[in-house]
Amino acid sequence: MISVNDFKTGLTIEVDNGIWRVLDFQHVKPGKGAAFVRSKLRNLRTGAIQEKTFRGGEKVAKAQIDNRKMAYLYADGTNHVFMDNESYEQIELPEDQIAHELKFLKENMEINIIMYQGETIGIDLPNTVELVVTATDPGIKGDTSSGGSKPATLETGLVVQVPFFVNEGDKLVINTTEAAYVSRA
């Protein structure tokens, strides 16, 4: 059991018969009344995001999850195949289970597979990934590094807002939690 006062981003907990990852949390101490913790949680089985409020000091069960390092191989219809680089064991995950993460996956990319009691429940992406711009409007002379942005389509199909100086073929660092441009690679 862990106190909600000890929440950290990325912590995995068991609440309401589900396995949840803490995406965001905020300790609130109102002027009148007891303190509480407002949190934003993602269900690791369904991908649903829910906001939940806990009383200060409330205890929740910490989920015992295992992470296995695997490489993303390919898409096979609606399933996606991953391989353990040590044992060469392959597993398939359905597209709807990892829909958000697919926007950042490239072939042969190393990621962590999240396992709970022997069941594969999702994947854990790195904080940032490097992706190549496949389509964007050309930069115009006079564009500066400050002010304004334009949409750019990346090699995985993800569309992000980028500064005007970014061109097709540029390799960018993308934040996976916010699906946002960070810098050029």
Swiss-Prot record:
GO molecular function annotations of the record: translation elongation factor activity
Superkingdom of this protein's organism: Bacteria
Cellular location(s): Cytoplasm
UniProt keyword list: Cytoplasm, Elongation factor, Protein biosynthesis
Pfam families in the record: EFP, EFP_N, Elong-fact-P_C
CDD domains assigned: S1_EF-P_repeat_1, S1_EF-P_repeat_2
A GO term from the CC aspect: cytoplasm
Biological pathway: Protein biosynthesis; polypeptide chain elongation
Example GO biological process: peptide biosynthetic process
HAMAP family tied to this protein: EF_P (MF_00141)
Family statement: Belongs to the elongation factor P family.
Protein name: Elongation factor P
Organism for this UniProt entry: Listeria monocytogenes serovar 1/2a (strain ATCC BAA-679 / EGD-e)
